[in-house]
Amino acid sequence: MSDSNKKTCNDAKQPILVLDLVRLVLERLSFVDFHRARCVSSVWYSASKSCIGGTNPTAPWIILFPNEHVKTNNDSCKSIDPRDHSSYTIRDLGFDMVRSRCLASSGSWFLMLDHKTDFHLLNLFTRERIPLPSLESIDGLQMKFVRTGDCGFEMSMYYKAHGLISYGKNSDLRISDAVLWVDEKNGDYFVVWFHHSTFAYHKKGGDNNSWKVFQPSKHQGCINMVFKEGKLYVLNPARNISVFDFSGGHSPVEYATPPSPNDDYYVRNLAVTLSGEVLIISSNPKKCFVKLYKIDPKSSEWRLIKSIGDEALILDLGITVAAKDGVMRNCIYFSHHELLRYKGVSLCNDDKYGICIYHIKTKKKVQEFEHLTTSSPILFKDARWFFPTFGGN
């Protein structure tokens, strides 16, 4: 190369050109290949951060959590794209997935409770982990936890009628329900969990690094809850729904809705539609039936419905989404029944729904995943539907 040619070559621009080329390659990859490729080197990882994110799947995926009785890498799990049945083993998470429980999800973020009873937010694709306040850090007198060892704790509850009651040592905190919301564009998050008549919540940028406690006015407990657009919807054992508005930034404001059908014992879930309507869902894992109710705007009473139109219900997320780009119309996406999940029962054949897509009008399964529960021993303890996302898209 001549001296003149050497002078026209600007070495300072070479890293930029490399990033541009890598970015062009990344933007043409599928979601799975995209996340594999971004781990090739620091250059590829840097380029992936500036990708617009056209690789995000438009239909929900299934995430599978490994069973402790199966020989596997403790820090891995498996995801499945149901449209083509392609699977992806997510390895080297740096987190003990076997001895941890997933409580909720938002995009690619998962609320995890580990074997030491510590809460974490875990992004399965970026491997990013955010530790949440410990159980001891609870702002309020209603609930108190004291560590008694590496995994154990002692819990005390304060009741107005009975005063302080201690429940002794425990090593297994059974969170009956939880919700998670994450804004992947700016990193904001909001977490709520319920245990023993008390709700605890925490959000990024709060006043302190602790869980704030609140209780519904009627202390009726919780069997399911959903968080959407700043509001927490709580279904209690009496089949009534309370709504807590967190948009004010301070203590939540409570609202009430008409009582749900109290003649239906199997009401276990609620959901919020795209238009903001509240649905309640009745189902039984031992029997093949599903009922959906919503409030009649004229009578303000709950009525049975047989269609949700051009939407699909993702039961794990408690929301409906538009039925397009691979999402099946007028269907419910089932995974692992919450009663079995709460009791720690692994995926099994006794669940008549199991992991499936169920058509509301025909009352038939339009897609099943029996191979995930027919192996012996069962390979997975839990499954959830989720929407993989990266970069806030």
UniProtKB/Swiss-Prot annotation:
Where does this protein chiefly localize? Answer: cytoplasm
Instruction: Fetch the Pfam families from UniProt.
Output: Beta-prop_KIB1-4, F-box
Report the record's Gene Ontology biological process terms.
brassinosteroid mediated signaling pathway; positive regulation of brassinosteroid mediated signaling pathway; ubiquitin-dependent protein catabolic process
Offer a single GO CC term for the protein. Answer: cytoplasm
Location relative to the cell: Cytoplasm; Nucleus, Nucleolus
Following inactivation of the gene, the phenotype reported is: Abolished brassinosteroid (BR)-induced ASK7/BIN2/SK21 degradation, and BR-insensitivity. Suppression of the constitutive BR-response phenotype in the dominant mutant bzr1-1D, and accumulation of phosphorylated BZR1.
> Would the keyword Zinc turn up in this protein's UniProt record?
no
Q: Cite the PANTHER family for this sequence.
A: F-BOX PROTEIN KIB2-RELATED, OS07G0183000 PROTEIN-RELATED
Q: What does this protein do?
A: Component of SCF(ASK-cullin-F-box) E3 ubiquitin ligase complexes, which may mediate the ubiquitination and subsequent proteasomal degradation of target proteins. Required for brassinosteroid (BR) signal transduction. Mediates ASK7/BIN2/SK21 inactivation both by competing with substrate binding (e.g. BZR1) and by promoting its ubiquitination and subsequent proteasomal degradation.
Instruction: Name it.
Output: F-box protein KIB4
Origin species: Arabidopsis thaliana (Mouse-ear cress)
Give the gene that encodes this protein.
KIB4
